[in-house]
Amino acid sequence: MVPLWWHISLGVALFVIGAAGVLLRRNILVVLMSLELLLNSVNINFIAFGRYYADFRGQIFAIFVIAITAAEVAVALGILVALVRNKSTLKVDDVTVMKG
């Protein structure tokens, strides 16, 4: 059996990569993919801890996170398509639609 710390270190590494992508990138699509990487790294940790403690709730919570993530991606891609049609850009800095 694989030790728990391998799963935790993989989850932490993916979380750091995703957080760096969200904070450092200016392309909306890359930020969205980095956010997905963040959520999937959390899912890895949920499943790893659930398996380590022989509890199925970690897997159930990961399934809920995946379902919520799918809805979030659908809404975000719809907004992304609307922004590309209106502004013709994918840069975060160029999008000031919500500014008053």
UniProtKB/Swiss-Prot annotation:
It is found in: Cell inner membrane. It catalyses: a quinone + NADH + 5 H(+)(in) = a quinol + NAD(+) + 4 H(+)(out). GO terms for molecular function: NADH:ubiquinone reductase (non-electrogenic) activity; quinone binding. Its main location: membrane. GO terms for biological process: ATP synthesis coupled electron transport. The chain crosses the membrane at residues 4-24, 28-48, 60-80. The keyword NAD applies. It is a multi-pass membrane protein. InterPro entries: NADH_UbQ_OxRdtase_chain4L/K (IPR001133), NUOK/Mnh_C1-like (IPR039428). Keywords: Cell inner membrane, Cell membrane, Membrane, NAD, Quinone, Translocase, Transmembrane, Transmembrane helix, Transport, Ubiquinone. The keyword rRNA-binding does not apply. It is an enzyme of class 7 (translocase). GO terms for cellular component: NADH dehydrogenase complex; plasma membrane. NDH-1 shuttles electrons from NADH, via FMN and iron-sulfur (Fe-S) centers, to quinones in the respiratory chain. The immediate electron acceptor for the enzyme in this species is believed to be ubiquinone. Couples the redox reaction to proton translocation (for every two electrons transferred, four hydrogen ions are translocated across the cytoplasmic membrane), and thus conserves the redox energy in a proton gradient. Belongs to the complex I subunit 4L family. NDH-1 is composed of 14 different subunits. Subunits NuoA, H, J, K, L, M, N constitute the membrane sector of the complex. PANTHER family: NADH-UBIQUINONE OXIDOREDUCTASE CHAIN 4L (PTHR11434:SF16), NADH-UBIQUINONE OXIDOREDUCTASE SUBUNIT ND4L (PTHR11434). NCBIfam families: PRK05715.1-2, PRK05715.1-3, PRK05715.1-5. This is NADH-quinone oxidoreductase subunit K 2. The lineage of its organism: Bacteria, Pseudomonadati, Pseudomonadota, Alphaproteobacteria, Hyphomicrobiales. The gene is nuoK2.
